[in-house]
Design a protein with these regions (language model features):
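Conserved catalytic core of the tyrosine transesterase superfamily
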Residues: 1-244
Length: 244
């Protein structure tokens, strides 16, 4: 990071304020990669797209997201030209337009297509079905979904309690369809995975018994969309915007 700051101030001639803003934005990515257990040299374009989608999911304003992604593109260009990495994964990364745009949403038919693309023979089928129904039926952020606790799901009163932005709790109504799929998952494949310390009460787990990462959810939904032949740009927040 020291070399990057020197590049920005000496070669680019940027002010100390701008240099600080760039480095703070890059630290956001580095923190994200740390959470996902990804080394900088292993970063791919798809991972950067997932990071951009995570910024959106956190409710960060368009102008702020544009600044962050511009800083990241500059960072990877510096790493490439300085010989720290062989390829620039951010070369094709697009930054959001500042004009007003409407997010893609899925029709009910497309939601059914997405669910229909789940391979029922896989161990993750029940979990993935429950995830899609929960995102679509509750309008959750992906960060809320992956931290959802079993004891916060009320099957009788049809609501869940999530920790939202600013670590504030909120009560969210949940559809009976979503609850039925959560119940099927809990009584089925959820009981077949080992429970790691600290994750026993987490609803959605990976096959090793750890809580899901945001990237896992992004990749799962993207692959299902491709299998279903849905050509829209799909991510977990697409399901959130499709929530009615």
């Amino acid at each position: 990071m020291r070399e990057f700051r020197g590049y920005l101030s000496l070669q680019r001639g940027l002010s100390p304020h701008t240099v600080a803003a760039y480095t703070d934005d890059v630290k956001k990515l580095l923190d994200y990669l740390l959470d996902e257990h990804v080394q900088l040299r292993d970063v791919t374009y798809e991972m950067l797209e997932n990071f951009a989608a995570a910024l959106y999911d956190l409710g960060i304003a368009v102008a702020s997201r544009k600044r962050v992604l511009c800083g990241i593109k500059t960072f990877f260009r510096f790493l490439r030209t300085s010989g720290f990495i062989e390829h620039d994964p951010a070369r094709l990364l697009q930054t959001p337009h500042l004009g007003r745009t409407l997010p893609d949403v899925l029709s009910v038919e497309e939601i059914d297509m997405l669910i229909g693309a789940i391979d029922p023979s896989t161990a993750e089928a029940e979990r993935n079905h429950a995830i899609i129904e929960t995102l679509y039926g509750c309008g959750l952020r992906v960060s809320e979904l992956i931290n959802l606790e079993i004891t916060r799901v009320s099957f009788d009163d049809e609501y869940i309690i999530v920790n939202g932005k600013g670590n504030k709790e909120r009560m969210v109504p949940v559809s009976r369809v979503a609850l039925d799929n959560i119940a099927a998952y809990l009584h089925g494949s959820r009981g077949m995975v080992p429970e790691k310390p600290g994750a026993a009460n987490i609803l959605f787990l990976n096959r090793r018994g750890n809580r899901l990462s945001r990237q896992m959810v992004f990749i799962m939904i993207k692959r299902l969309a491709e299998a279903a032949g849905i050509r829209k740009r799909i991510s977990p927040h697409t399901l959130r915007h499709s929530f009615a």
